[in-house]
């Protein structure tokens, strides 16, 4: 599955430092803690947060944050149905993506190398489905 939204895309010179943003583009349910606090933010850590929220929806069917205050504080609440099994390594990846401190939050290299994702496509189909 690939999800892409180019609504706020800009061309960035890779030799220049990544810019900070002050305007928010998107849906608040997926907005990073620093964005909700109206702090200047960098796009890569904010996008990793969004990935964490998306993982919660895909794995549990629910948002990891009951309220905006919970999102700002990084208080994750996993509402998992008894019939749903979320692998511990998947939950660990989601929590790394949802760290309220953008400096401590996982980066794309950590996500890409995470044990839950590495080798997943080598598994038989029935083992890839949660």
Language-model regions, residue ranges each:
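Activation segment/activation loop of eukaryotic-type protein kinase catalytic domains
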Residues: 1-25
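Conserved activation segment of eukaryotic-like protein kinases, specifically the C-terminal portion
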Residues: 21-35
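Conserved end of the kinase activation segment
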Residues: 35-45
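Hydrophobic anchor on a C-lobe helix of Hanks-type protein kinase catalytic domains
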Residues: 58-59
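Short proline-rich PxxP-based motifs
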Residues: 73-84
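Conserved C-terminal C-lobe helix
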Residues: 85-98
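Terminal C-lobe "cap" of eukaryotic-type protein kinase domains
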Residues: 100-104, 108-124
């Amino acid at each position: 599955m690939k999800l892409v939204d180019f609504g706020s895309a800009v061309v960035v010179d890779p030799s220049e430092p990544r810019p900070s943003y002050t305007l928010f583009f998107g849906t608040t349910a997926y907005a990073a803690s620093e964005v909700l606090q109206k702090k200047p933010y960098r796009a890569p850590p904010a996008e990793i947060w969004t990935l964490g929220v998306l993982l919660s929806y895909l794995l549990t069917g629910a948002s990891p944050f009951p309220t905006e205050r919970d999102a700002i504080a990084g208080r994750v609440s996993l509402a998992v149905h008894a019939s749903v099994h979320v692998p511990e390594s998947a939950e660990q990846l989601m929590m790394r993506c949802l760290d309220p401190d953008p400096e401590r939050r996982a980066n794309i290299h950590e996500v890409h190398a995470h044990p839950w994702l590495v080798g997943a496509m080598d598994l038989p189909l029935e083992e890839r489905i949660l």
